[in-house]
């Protein structure tokens, strides 16, 4: 099974990816992980990618496509398929992906953006152990139930930054949603449900 997972920051994509790769026994292909392993292994394409990252520049589409292509050509993906996360990010990447891999389904976890904003800006993390909480369930507590550490809001979880991230995501992703909808591959799932309900809906629609 060859599946792409789409979802805005805070939509629970990572949680669903973990559950899906367990159920369907397919490798979870995250572009961030592939970049890190290529850079760490100092592969020619990893060295190329690092040269852009070190300058604070975006890695060109052609380099990203090549890194993903190499990973999808490995034995585990050839045998079992994949769950692709973080790629494609634009139409060029989607069209290139279609040239070397048959994408079967594209799962879009759709979440009400105002609820998403509340979910992310209300997030608090323990400064010591990293445990995550939400202000709605803290009842005014300011310390971690696990280790007693101070609960803080991440610098990039403020309303202005989150709002910008969501706007960029929507602008980038809507053309992809349209692209895969036209191809008859799009599955839209209601991400405002509980984790288990979202998972059940994805599995039902994947068949």
Residue ranges and their predicted role:
Residues 27-102, 125, 154, 199:
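ATP-dependent small-molecule kinase phosphotransfer cores
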Residues 150-207:
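NTP-dependent small-molecule kinase module
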Residues 84-132, 136:
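ATP-dependent NMP and nucleoside kinases share a basic, alpha-helical "lid"
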Residues 5:
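Hydrophobic anchor at the beta1->P-loop junction of P-loop NTPases
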């Amino acid at each position: 099974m060859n599946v792409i997972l789409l979802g805005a920051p805070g939509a629970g994509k990572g949680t669903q990816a973990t559950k899906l790769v367990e159920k369907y026994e397919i490798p979870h292909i995250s572009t961030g992980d592939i970049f890190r392993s290529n850079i760490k292994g100092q592969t020619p394409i990893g060295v190329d990618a690092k040269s852009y990252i070190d300058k604070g520049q975006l890695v060109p589409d052609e380099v990203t496509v090549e890194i993903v292509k190499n990973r999808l050509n490995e034995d585990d993906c050839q045998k079992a398929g994949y769950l692709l996360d973080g790629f494609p990010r634009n139409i060029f990447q989607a069209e290139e992906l279609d040239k070397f891999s048959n994408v079967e389904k594209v799962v879009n976890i759709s979440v009400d953006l105002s609820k998403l904003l509340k979910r992310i800006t209300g997030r608090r993390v323990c400064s010591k152990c990293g445990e995550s909480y939400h202000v709605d369930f803290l009842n005014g507590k300011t310390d971690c139930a696990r280790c007693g550490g101070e609960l803080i809001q991440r610098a990039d979880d403020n309303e202005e930054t989150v709002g910008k991230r969501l706007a960029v995501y929507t602008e980038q992703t809507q053309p992809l949603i349209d692209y895969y909808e036209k191809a008859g591959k799009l599955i839209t799932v209601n991400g405002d449900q509980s984790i288990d309900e979202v998972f059940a809906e994805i599995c039902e629609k994947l068949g």
